C-alpha cells in the first residue's frame, strides 16, 4: 500500500471526528507517553459488603497453578503471572487483566486472593489493562469476588480504590 493511500485512509477516518474526540485523543496520547503514578492511595475507603444475586458462573479460564486459557490459547506462567503478557495478542492480555476467572465455578478463594495480591505487586508499574474498560471490568470482578467470599483486606481495598479513582479521570470521549 502506498504512502498516499495510507494518508487518504487516515484522512477519511479522522475527518469525521468531533473536536471533543480530537481533544481526548490528544489527552490519551499524552497519558500513554507520560503515564500517571499508579501507586495506591494512602486513604482507606469506607467499605460495605454487597449481596450479589447468584448468576451464571463465568467460563472456566483459570486452570490452576497460574495457567490460563483465553481464546483457545493456553499459557502457564510458573511462579508469577506476567500481567503485561502480549505474546498471544493484546486481546488475550486484556482477558487476563479482566479477572473474570475470579467468578468461575469452583474457583478456590485462597487462589483467587493470591492472584489479586500478585496483581497488586505488579500494579505500580502496570501499563496493560489501564484503559477504562479493563479497569472497570476488573474492578467489578474484584468487588463481586470479595463480597461473595466475605474478604475484607485493607491492601486489596486500597488498590481497588486507586483503580476506581484512576477510572474517574479516564473518560472515553476519544471513541
Per-range role (PLM):
Residues 89-175:
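Aromatic-lined, polymer-binding surfaces characteristic
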Residues 8, 42, 46, 65, ...:
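Acidic-enriched, low-complexity/disordered segments with a strong bias for Aspartate over Glutamate
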Residues 77-86:
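Repeat-mediated protein-protein interaction surfaces in helical alpha-solenoids
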Residues 72, 85-87, 103:
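Pocket-edge structural micro-motifs
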Residues 1-78:
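Extreme N-terminal leader/anchor segments
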Residues 4, 8, 79-80, 116, ...:
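A generic structural signal for ordered alpha-helices
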Amino acid at each position: 500500500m502506498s504512502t498516499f493511500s495510507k494518508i487518504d485512509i487516515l484522512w477519511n477516518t479522522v475527518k469525521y471526528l468531533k473536536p471533543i474526540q480530537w481533544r481526548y485523543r490528544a489527552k490519551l496520547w499524552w497519558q500513554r507517553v507520560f503515564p500517571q503514578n499508579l501507586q495506591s492511595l494512602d486513604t482507606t475507603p469506607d467499605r460495605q459488603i454487597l449481596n450479589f444475586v447468584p448468576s451464571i458462573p463465568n467460563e472456566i479460564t483459570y486452570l490452576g497453578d497460574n495457567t490460563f486459557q483465553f481464546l483457545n490459547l493456553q499459557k502457564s506462567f510458573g511462579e508469577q503471572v506476567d500481567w503485561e503478557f502480549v505474546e498471544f495478542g493484546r486481546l488475550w492480555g486484556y482477558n487476563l487483566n479482566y479477572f473474570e476467572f475470579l467468578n468461575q465455578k469452583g474457583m478456590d478463594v485462597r487462589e483467587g486472593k493470591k492472584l489479586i495480591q500478585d496483581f497488586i505487586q505488579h500494579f505500580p508499574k502496570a501499563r496493560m489493562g489501564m484503559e477504562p474498560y479493563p479497569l472497570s471490568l476488573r474492578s467489578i470482578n474484584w468487588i463481586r469476588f470479595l463480597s461473595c467470599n466475605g474478604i475484607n483486606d485493607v491492601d486489596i481495598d486500597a488498590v481497588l480504590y486507586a483503580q476506581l479513582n484512576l477510572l474517574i479521570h479516564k473518560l472515553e470521549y476519544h471513541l
